[in-house]
Design a protein with these regions (language model features):
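Nucleic-acid substrate recognition interfaces
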Residues: 1-171
């Protein structure tokens, strides 16, 4: 199958032109779940790489090509990773924070993880929460000329809404 189909559990309409979806994904196959989680980890890594590259003065056009080659993901995902990286940088600058000290996945959780007194289940739970925030990002914008979002698209299969995910590498 070229595109992964995921069951959609909830949706929320933001206005008449666009749909914002908040959902819990339920997977029919563990293989599908693994592939989507891999895509999310790659995308999260792309955002962090783009952020560091922007700090070092990289240009968007060159960075977009580099990200696509390095991670084996299409340029739409690369462009969106660059957008998120720029938004993170702007947010740091607006908040008068040092952009070089940004911690992806929440500084607060990271600082708690660094404490030596945490052990066992509480540490594992905290680490899982931090990793979900750090690696659990997937963002893709739609395009009017392409009639919506080609990477993430809602489809109705047998009266059930599903999310079709383009894995970014032609699958």
């Amino acid at each position: 199958m070229n595109k992964e189909v995921l069951k959609m559990l909830t949706e929320k309409k933001s206005n008449s032109n666009f749909v914002t979806v908040e959902c819990l994904l339920a997977f029919d196959k563990d293989e599908d779940k693994g592939r989507v989680l891999t895509l999310m980890r790659k995308f999260s890594s792309m955002v962090r790489f783009a952020y560091k590259s922007i700090l070092h003065g990289a240009e968007r056009k060159e960075l977009k090509k580099l990200l696509s080659r390095k991670y084996g993901i299409n340029t739409r995902y690369s462009d969106d990773a660059i957008l998120l990286a720029k938004q993170n940088l702007e947010s740091c600058l607006e908040g008068n924070q040092n952009p070089k000290k940004l911690v992806f996945g929440s500084r607060e959780l990271f600082e708690q993880l660094k404490k030596k007194h945490l052990a066992g289940k509480s540490r594992d739970t905290l680490r899982q929460k931090w990793e979900e925030r750090r690696y659990g990002i997937l963002y893709s914008r739609g395009d009017k000329s392409r009639e919506g979002n080609l990477n993430l698209r809602l489809v109705n299969l047998n009266n059930q809404w599903c999310l079709r995910v383009n894995l970014g590498n032609g699958e």
